[in-house]
């Protein structure tokens, strides 16, 4: 009887006029059915029942048979009692009258009452929600099964809004596009690898700027009437009527959530901090190509720290690095990390490394980790480079763009090796475990893979001009 509010869409009439936005017609059929659903009628026991559980009220009738319960309900729709099982003492049953029959449900209590997934504060709420669900699923089973077939989601404006934001982002990114024209120096570098790798490495792929993000749906209890923003149908029940995206606030039926496109546009008000936030979620929320932390820190480092000895290898004071982290979490892009506030450049490099370490999903994602490790194990240099490039193409767009930008920066660091003593191998040692972590939290795996992590970052830095 767990009232599952999984639903979908039946035919909706939507204006075809693309030039003028028309609000969707919210469908009232399921709302009307909820209003018509039988109301719970508690059948009170006229006597005091010994050993009645403290969390049950006078609807508890003690140890009685199914036949006695049926007689007490008297054929009244929505009537209910609680009883203790004759066959299994200590087990409790909800007897409920619906559809001209008595339905019996095993009843549980763990601080809240439940017969399925939903937890209720009171038996009255449990029965009310159950009657609504039974009534709607009995009266509208076919209607519910067809709800997702003709969604109004596109017409509400989410997809249009997304396309506009992507267009604006693309227009801004024209100042820093992926490389499509090969200079003489790049041509010389490309000759180092096979023609197959060269063709793949220099292929322009606009999809990397079309950042897709899945919605982060979680079961939600809506206070007051709510309608699904995918199918436009009412979200029935008292609690857990549907799901809400915790990043953008989209409200839909659980069933409809399976059909929503990966077009989450996070709301800044819902993003509590910068550090420890999913990379794609952060860039979508701020409508940027890369996390602001990466851009701001790298600009500061390149402005005053490229010649600093041991750059990225030397650690800054932990307390000051935490201060930078808090500044970004508090002030966002307005965080002041200038030399006036943090004269030691190692604090800024430490803050950048900390950002990468704190990512829930590393820059080199868990999904691609083993593929990168396998690529690093290839002995032939050309084949290894080709394999690395193929795996790069599997990274989510925001992760790819962040990695690309970081590698361009680290290449600049190596160009100042005579001053900072940091070559690609040294940077690989620093950034290998920072940018890529094994999916399983195994110390043995981490230690075994460290040399391959280092090698991958080293390859990315040394071949930045042909891999990205």
From Swiss-Prot:
GO CC, any one term: cytosol
Superkingdom of source: Eukaryota
Ranges for region Disordered: 1-20
A Pfam entry, by short name: C1_1
UniProt tissue specificity: Highest levels in the brain and pancreas. Also expressed in the heart, placenta, and weakly in the kidney and liver. Expression is much reduced in the malignant gliomas, compared to normal brain or low-grade astrocytomas.
Coiled-coil parts of chain: none
Keyword DNA damage applies: no
Molecular-function annotations in GO: GTPase activator activity; zinc ion binding
Zinc finger (Phorbol-ester/DAG-type): 214-264
Keyword terms, alphabetized: GTPase activation, Membrane, Metal-binding, SH2 domain, Zinc, Zinc-finger
SUPFAM superfamilies: Cysteine-rich domain, GTPase activation domain, GAP, SH2 domain
Amino acid composition bias (Low complexity), ranges on this chain: 1-16
Single biological process term from Gene Ontology: signal transduction
The Rho-GAP domain, residue ranges: 277-468
Location relative to the cell: Membrane
Domain SH2: 59-127
Annotated membrane topology: Peripheral membrane protein
Activity regulation details: In the inactive state, the N terminus protrudes into the active site of the Rho-GAP domain, sterically blocking Rac binding. Phospholipid binding to the Phorbol-ester/DAG-type zinc-finger/C1 domain triggers the cooperative dissociation of these interactions, allowing the N-terminus to move out of the active site and thereby activating the enzyme.
Site keyed Arginine finger: positions: 313
Task performed by this protein: GTPase-activating protein for p21-rac. Insufficient expression of beta-2 chimaerin is expected to lead to higher Rac activity and could therefore play a role in the progression from low-grade to high-grade tumors.
PANTHER family linked to this entry: BETA-CHIMAERIN, CHIMERIN FAMILY MEMBER
Record's protein name: Beta-chimaerin
Gene name in the database record: CHN2
């Amino acid at each position: 009887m767990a009232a599952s509010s999984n639903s979908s869409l039946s035919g909706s009439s939507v204006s075809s006029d693309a030039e003028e936005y028309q609000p969707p017609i919210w469908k009232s059929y399921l709302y009307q059915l909820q209003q018509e659903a039988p109301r719970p009628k508690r059948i009170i026991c006229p006597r005091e029942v010994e050993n009645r559980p403290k969390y049950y009220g006078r609807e508890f009738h003690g140890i009685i048979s199914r036949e006695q319960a049926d007689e007490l309900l008297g054929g009244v729709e929505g009537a209910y009692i609680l009883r203790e099982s004759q066959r299994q003492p200590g087990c409790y049953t909800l007897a409920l009258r619906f559809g001209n029959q008595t339905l019996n449900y095993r009843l549980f209590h763990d601080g809240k009452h439940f017969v399925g997934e939903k937890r209720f504060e009171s038996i009255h709420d449990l029965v009310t929600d159950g009657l609504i669900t039974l009534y709607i699923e009995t009266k509208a089973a076919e209607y519910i099964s067809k709800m997702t077939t003709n969604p109004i989601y596109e017409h509400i404006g989410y997809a249009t809004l997304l396309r506009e934001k992507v267009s604006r982002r693309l227009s801004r990114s024209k100042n820093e596009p992926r490389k499509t024209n090969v200079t003489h120096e790049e041509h010389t570098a490309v000759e180092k690898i096979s023609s197959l790798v060269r063709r793949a490495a220099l292929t322009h792929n606009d999809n990397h700027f079309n950042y897709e993000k899945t919605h982060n749906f979680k079961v939600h209890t809506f206070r007051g009437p709510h309608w699904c923003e995918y199918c436009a149908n009412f979200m029935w029940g008292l609690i857990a009527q549907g799901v809400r995206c915790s990043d953008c606030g989209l409200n839909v039926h659980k069933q409809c959530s399976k059909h929503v496109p990966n077009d989450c546009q996070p709301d800044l008000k819902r993003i509590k901090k910068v550090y420890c936030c999913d990379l794609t979620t952060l860039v979508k929320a701020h409508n940027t190509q890369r996390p602001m932390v990466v851009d701001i820190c790298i600009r500061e480092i390149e402005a005053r720290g490229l010649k600093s000895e041991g750059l990225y290898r030397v650690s800054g004071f932990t307390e000051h690095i935490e201060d930078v982290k808090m500044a970004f979490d508090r002030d966002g892009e307005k965080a002041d990390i200038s030399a006036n506030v943090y004269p030691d450049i190692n604090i800024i490099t430490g803050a950048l490394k900390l950002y990468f370490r704190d990512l829930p999903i590393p820059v080199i994602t868990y999904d691609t980790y083993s593929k990168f490790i396998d690529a690093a194990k290839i002995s032939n240099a050309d084949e290894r480079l080709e394999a690395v490039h193929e795996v790069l193409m599997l990274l989510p767009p925001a992760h790819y763009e962040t990695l690309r930008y970081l590698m361009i920066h680290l290449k600049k660091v190596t160009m100042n090796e005579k001053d900072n003593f940091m070559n690609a191998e040294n940077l690989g040692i620093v950034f290998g475990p920072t940018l890529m972590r094994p999916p399983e939290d195994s110390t043995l795996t981490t230690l075994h893979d460290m040399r391959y992590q280092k090698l991958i970052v080293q390859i990315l830095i040394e071949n930045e001009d042909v891999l990205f």
